[in-house]
Amino acid sequence: MDVSPLPPYLGPVSSPTEPSRTPDFLNHDRPPVPDIVVPRGVQPFHLRDKPVRGRLVRLGALADALLTRHDNDPAVTTLAGQALALTAGLAAALKFRGSFSLQAKGDGPVPMLLADCTDSGALRGYARADAEKLAPHLADGATPTAAAMLGQGYLAFTCDQGPEMERYQGLVAIEGDSLTEMTGSYFRHSEQLATHVHLACARTPSGWRAAALILERVAGAGGVGEELDEDAQDDAWRTALALAATLTDTELLDDTLPGERLLHRLFHLEGLALDRARALSYGCRCSRARLSGVLAGFGADDLDHMAEDGVITMTCEFCNLGFRFDRSDITSAEQG
């Protein structure tokens, strides 16, 4: 993996630009977090005696709860939903304690796309959009590609296991029109791992839904595919890809079609075996206490500059909740 240690990261706690919708303001410590848990949000699986493993990700109502915190154009919301599903699926394949994140940063009308998932399945994310720059891409009802929205920049996947551990990041230039193609480029260049990624996000009669199907070719050793010679492994991988290619966005996002049945439709003739499912939940972790600690790290002059009529306002970019602080209540780091 192409990795490099990163400096400490606090996360986006305050928006430097106007939020995508008017934030809801709170003065108590913890915002009301939606009690949404998807028990089988990620369904890992493998194909017996074949070099194929995968994850089916379906966010269900969790997608709507996360995506509707911001009043973005549907094209931007679709991109954000795909990022959420992809991040949940990739995180489920790792053994870690902390958070795993996807970040795309570019010079386009959506300069920042971010999603992260903890080891317990708490998921959050957002897309920061510039409506003025985006408008030309939406002319005549056009739907811009992910590449057009993000522009030139980079795609990064980061595993953060806390302040006592190094953070590792795989980073590649944005290549490809869609987030699916960008992810494929990342795995080819950084992981050198054969993958198949199908991402879907759309507004349905039940609200926004987001889902993903991820396939990975694994090494022949270790019990998966070890009984097959190289040619047979190649054939098994090609067969899995051909079957996965028959999946439609409609099927992937269909709440009435259980995930187990969907996987059975695709792979039942290939020795499908379901592994332990993973729950996903609403995962914004902002709080008044945390943001107060961030403010305390600024100098007095900076705090004075932030204040308007004696009040400092901070908005969580993930959930779009705003917090108000009296300037007189914040003691800067230089004041001790």
Roles of regions detected by a PLM:
Residues 3-276:
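Interaction interfaces in information-processing and related assembly proteins
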Residues 241, 245-336:
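Cys/His-clustered metal-coordination modules, chiefly Zn-binding fingers
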